[in-house]
Curated annotation (Swiss-Prot):
Pathway(s) where this gene product acts: tRNA modification; tRNA-queuosine biosynthesis
Protein name: Queuine tRNA-ribosyltransferase
Gene behind the chain: tgt
Species name: Prochlorococcus marinus (strain MIT 9303)
Record Pfam families: TGT
Listed EC numbers: 2.4.2.29
Cofactors that this protein relies on: Zn(2+)
Summary of the function given for this chain in its UniProt record: Catalyzes the base-exchange of a guanine (G) residue with the queuine precursor 7-aminomethyl-7-deazaguanine (PreQ1) at position 34 (anticodon wobble position) in tRNAs with GU(N) anticodons (tRNA-Asp, -Asn, -His and -Tyr). Catalysis occurs through a double-displacement mechanism. The nucleophile active site attacks the C1' of nucleotide 34 to detach the guanine base from the RNA, forming a covalent enzyme-RNA intermediate. The proton acceptor active site deprotonates the incoming PreQ1, allowing a nucleophilic attack on the C1' of the ribose to form the product.
Length: 372
């Protein structure tokens, strides 16, 4: 039911083109995944989202458990039917949100107890419970429950988080029973190379359908992100999709692809769009700026999104300045289209074996400067 096939390699880097088959369709990799935390990418319908070229969307177990609850989603026929999305879905376990957002009362080897931010009640979440919730939600891919240490953290604290993550992965694997849902493990280890190597080896030993690299983009220097990805990716199974969590800038995506990463997700494109910022030609454009007031050209002549095909910079400026919701939707659609087109262009370059030349300006040793 799940299959990952590699169709092309770059002859100069570890970049590859693949196809990840799921019960709800295929995901062509490398591929950026929009984030629909609460079963929606904010301000965008499922039909509009499909028009951006999105093939797989991420939703969040923590937030959906709090509201509306996995029972309601299951009664609706699962997350796909609940949100009207018939393509692949992935649910994050909620571990990152719990350790970064929630008011933690207790964390131990059994699990975590935290305060519900909506009503103040106590909630206990264990690896088993996290998997039960994700099985009820019914996404194509469920993520193992892990402990994501903050940055900075001491080596001893990161090592303890790794041991807990590995023990929890075993419990997640034992609990997960669905054949129509793939379980992905998560590599942790902070910025410590030996802990990353150890975690990669342990997670790979579970022989799961896919593996993610977690605990990056949590405040560490970008150079550490590059180093971690370059170190960990070659340690993961060649025949499984590799997912780099929380990465959504062009440079970071290009660098990660060169290291052999296949999947990415990030709230950046939609968050920027909701704040009036468009991603154009490697730059961030603030559409509130007066320079767009009388500019009747599209944001990007080559872009296929609704905003660029039907509207001008002046109109988008007008919408954003007047806080019209349509402006936020149009910019979110544009930004998502830009990210997805970028990964599609990378894919074509790998197939043509010109990735290392065409995307050299995005690599860390390039003098070219890109703001996103």
């Amino acid at each position: 039911m799940f299959d990952f096939q590699i169709n092309a390699h770059c002859s100069h880097t570890r970049a590859r083109v693949g196809c990840f088959r799921t019960p709800h369709g295929s995901v062509n990799t490398p591929r950026f995944m929009p984030v629909g935390t609460l079963a929606t990418v904010k301000g965008i319908t499922a039909t509009q989202l499909a028009d951006t070229g999105a093939q797989m969307v991420l939703a969040n177990t923590y937030h959906l458990h709090l509201q509306p609850g996995e029972g309601i989603v299951a009664d609706a026929g699962g997350l796909h039917r609940f949100m009207g999305w018939d393509r692949p879905l992935l649910t994050d376990s909620g571990g990152f949100q719990i350790f970064s957002l929630a008011d933690l009362n207790r964390i131990d080897d059994h699990g975590v107890v935290f305060r519900n931010p909506r009503n103040g009640s106590q909630i206990e979440l264990t690896p088993e419970r996290a998997i039960e919730i994700q099985m009820a939600l019914g996404a194509d891919v469920a993520m193992a429950f892990d402990q994501c240490p903050p940055y900075p953290a001491s080596e001893s604290d990161v090592e303890a988080a790794c041991k807990r993550t590995h023990a929890w992965l075993e419990r997640c694997s034992n609990t997960h029973q669905l054949t129509n849902q793939a379980l992905f493990g998560i590599v942790q280890g902070g910025c410590f190379p030996h802990l990353r190597e150890q975690s990669a080896q342990i997670v790979a030993s579970f022989d799961l359908p896919g593996i993610a690299i977690g605990g990056v983009s949590v405040g560490e220097p970008v150079e550490d992100i590059h180093r971690i990805v370059r170190q960990v990716s070659p340690l993961l199974p060649q025949d499984r999709p590799r997912y780099l969590m929380g990465i959504g800038t062009l440079r970071e995506i290009a660098i990660a692809v060169a290291s052999g990463i296949d999947l990415f997700d990030c709230v950046l494109p939609t968050r920027l769009g909701r704040h009036g910022t468009a991603l154009v030609a490697g730059e961030r454009w603030n559409l509130r700026n007066a320079r767009f007031r009388e500019d009747h050209t599209p944001l990007d002549q080559s872009c296929t999104c609704t905003a660029c095909r039907h509207h001008s910079r002046a109109y988008l400026h007008h919408l954003i300045r007047n806080e019209e919701l349509l402006g936020l939707t149009l910019l979110s659609l544009h930004n998502l289209t830009q990210l997805i087109r970028f990964t599609s262009a990378i894919s074509q370059a790998i197939q043509d074996d010109c990735f290392s030349e065409d995307f050299a300006p995005w690599q860390p040793d390039s003098a070219a400067h890109h703001t996103w």
